[in-house]
Amino acid sequence: IVIGDWSSDVCSSDLVKELQTIPDKISRIIDDKERLQWFASKQANAKDIFFIGRGIDYAISLEGSLKMKEISYIHSEAYAAGELKHGTISLIEDGTLVIGVLTQPKLYEKTVSNMVECKSRGAYLMGLTTFGNYNIEDTADFTVYIPKTDPHFATSLAVIPLQLLGRSEERRVGKECRSRW
């Protein structure tokens, strides 16, 4: 909440109020886990999964990739979306699963542009964004929505579906999860 003291744009009492809504928003995400299980079953043959994002969404991508590797033992990597053109794009082939994280409104269009590049190479796209960003459905093959929140707390919500996806993949491939949920 110290952020509120640093920024004239952010009121600390508003941040406290928003922070108090996070547990309910996490519950709503978990209530939608069957959609992620369905999606995981459709991606049953994925051998490589790439996560892309910009800014803080890149950090979310790193966490999603780590959870995918830790939980399901499926090869995954996270990349800064703007760096795809520097060789990484050559790893994308027909059917490769690419998960684009789009929680930062100012970076949304640029990340969508990178997702379009991946799709042109045959990638199957999953978008992870907030409710209301329905334009992503024009690009992504599957979209997961998280409740709207202050951008300071988007990471707290965005990692939940990625962890659930990793857990669904873990069950699909028959690996035992080493951590308890």
Which residue stretches match the model-derived regions?
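Long, non-coiled-coil amphipathic alpha-helical linker/lever segments
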Residues: L15, I22, I26-K33
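Glycine-rich phosphate-binding loops that contact phosphosugars or nucleotide phosphates
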Residues: S7-T21, R54, V101-S156, L164, ...
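Single conserved hydrophobic/aromatic residue that forms the stacking wall/gate
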Residues: I1-V10, E170-W181
